[in-house]
């Protein structure tokens, strides 16, 4: 039996979609929340029997929020369909507020036959600790039911355009900064939910053998510390990892290196004028262009010091050597990762599930050899 839908919208106007699903991280005057949803029965064919839109306001009572409207409707309908398993997907213009996140977490705990994936265009009050904690509770994986939350990227915006927008036959045209904003929001959500790296991803990409093949990605793990009473205090809210963005005709046509994604992220933190130390652990040392831009950043931000530990040196010939020298000359500390840095990354950024770091054969020897090469590069100021 098909469900009876109330308080829903069949399709939204194109202007409504572009205005409300703008993924610019900081926006004002977006007080209406749009929630597009799909409900599928879990099984081999997984037919979609519900695909509609709820709309609500940010500031009235929580019962007026679209998440609460959906839960009210779905709970009533589920009373007649308790035995069926469902997969629910939301596409929302704002991530849930604290009360909605708590209500959704309670709903999932009460109804383990329902799985929920939430794609969000923007993060609501992501800098407030109570909002951060509510989303962590909603998405925690401690063996119980939880939601999966992701940032909308091109494919999700395209899907919403096709399924929920009265496009009048016109194709979806993404905003120019959609991929850059996605990268910022994706990294911020990773910080907020404390995402960790798969162990295989870490050991494959951070292996410090001097010659490797097939590893085109760069991973960058980072942490931020603030000076307080002559000691460095770790800021847990600014800790995570990034990787380079592959070339994408819908996003970055030429791709975007992890270091540049990281530089995009730092202003988003809105650091004050106190002294900060930023430490990066990278699978490859920066290329010439990235090194130059990182050097420009620290030369302008005198209150931010930068430490870079690289697992390997990226093609250290010619201009790339000069890029590292410029970065070093402008005040960055550059070093090769040794056992202690690999172990720290494993303990801090990897989903190790209690397993200790196991060094691979030749780790120390490779680290010593790479350190010698790096010293030669940095000391060769005349070339």
Curated annotation (Swiss-Prot):
Q: Which Pfam families match?
A: NAD2
Segments carrying the region annotation (Essential for cytoplasmic localization) are 1-60
Names of required cofactors: Zn(2+)
Q: Where is this site: Interaction with DNA?
A: 244
> Please, one GO biological process term?
transposable element silencing
What reactions does this protein catalyze?
A: a 2'-deoxycytidine in single-stranded DNA + H2O + H(+) = a 2'-deoxyuridine in single-stranded DNA + NH4(+)
Q: Which residues carry this modification: Phosphothreonine?
A: 32, 218
Q: Where is the CMP/dCMP-type deaminase domain?
A: 29-138, 214-327
Where does the chain bind Zn(2+) 2? 257, 287, 290
Which residue positions are annotated as catalytic?
A: 259
Q: Which GO terms describe its molecular function?
A: cytidine deaminase activity; RNA binding; zinc ion binding
Query: According to its UniProt record, where is this protein located?
Result: Cytoplasm; Nucleus; Cytoplasm, P-body
Report the domain of life of the source organism: Eukaryota
Q: What class of enzyme is it?
A: hydrolase
Coiled-coil blocks: none
Q: Which SUPFAM superfamilies does the protein's record reference?
A: Cytidine deaminase-like
Q: What is known of its domains?
A: The CMP/dCMP deaminase domain 1 mediates RNA binding, RNA-dependent oligomerization and virion incorporation whereas the CMP/dCMP deaminase domain 2 confers deoxycytidine deaminase activity and substrate sequence specificity.
> What quaternary arrangement does the UniProt entry report?
Homodimer. Homooligomer. Can bind RNA to form ribonucleoprotein complexes of high-molecular-mass (HMM) or low-molecular-mass (LMM). HMM is inactive and heterogeneous in protein composition because of binding nonselectively to cellular RNAs, which in turn are associated with variety of cellular proteins. The LMM form which is enzymatically active has few or no RNAs associated. Its ability to form homooligomer is distinct from its ability to assemble into HMM. Interacts with APOBEC3B, APOBEC3F, MOV10, AGO2, EIF4E, EIF4ENIF1, DCP2 and DDX6 in an RNA-dependent manner.
**Name the record gives this protein:** DNA dC->dU-editing enzyme APOBEC-3G
Q: Could you read off the lineage of the organism from its UniProt record?
A: Eukaryota, Metazoa, Chordata, Craniata, Vertebrata
